[in-house]
Amino acid sequence: MNLFPNCNLPAGTGRRLTGSQRYWELAGRDFKRFFAVNLLTLLGLSPFGFGVLLSILSSSILALIPACVIGGIAAGPALSCMHDAIFRSLRDAPGAWFENYKRAWKQNWRQAIIPGIIFCLLLGFYSFMLMTFWWASRLPSPGTVAVYVLGLVLLTMFFSLYWPQIALFEQSGKQRFQNCLLFMIRYFGKTLGCALLQLLYWTAMILFLPWTSILLPFAGVWFILFTADFLLYPAMDEAFQIEEQITKAFPEQAPFYEDDEAWLERKQKKE
């Protein structure tokens, strides 16, 4: 099962592809692992989703807070593991997906709980606020809408950079916070573009419910996060020296490349 076949990719040259060819190569090659990790991520996000839905249906802000706290405990590690799978794909790290997933969960769950709670609280309040706009007898003012959208964009920009750092590095929360701010300033246009892309994606998913629910198991979380991480990866690697640091710390994760002729020759020798 593969929604992104690699039939139009060029012959292997022993080097990484670039641009759209690289994008479709990774999407096709690692679709099965993305599909599996996506299901686990949806499972981790489900307590938060059901909790927010319940609080909105009951119009209770008091129900929203514990729902976001409990949901964040599961959502934080799940999102960090999703980004871990994506960044392993981006740097061509070897290993079976389930072994890598278990390793990422053990390494990241403690560091991801508090950010997960904060993220879910903020996102939950934004979701509840959106419904108050819908319930209100009058439309909100343009200024209110602008502040709402700006806050949502900044939230998306910040956590688009924060989750990958949990997956990639062992750092303090303060260091990650500083890295996010500095990266957003230096690469503001690219970070803003990726945040807007994610918001447009999720807006479309929400507007076209329940039909888009069919897509959730196949492309729900991983597809847009993979796209955003793919676009940000060159800048993040330049800023944080991702591949250099990981290769030094974990030599076994260094990728191995060979052209098609070398691969065929090696396979023939084995046979």
Q: Each predicted region: which residue ranges?
A:
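Helix-coil boundary and N-terminal low-complexity module in membrane systems
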Residues: 1-131, 135, 141-144, 148, ...
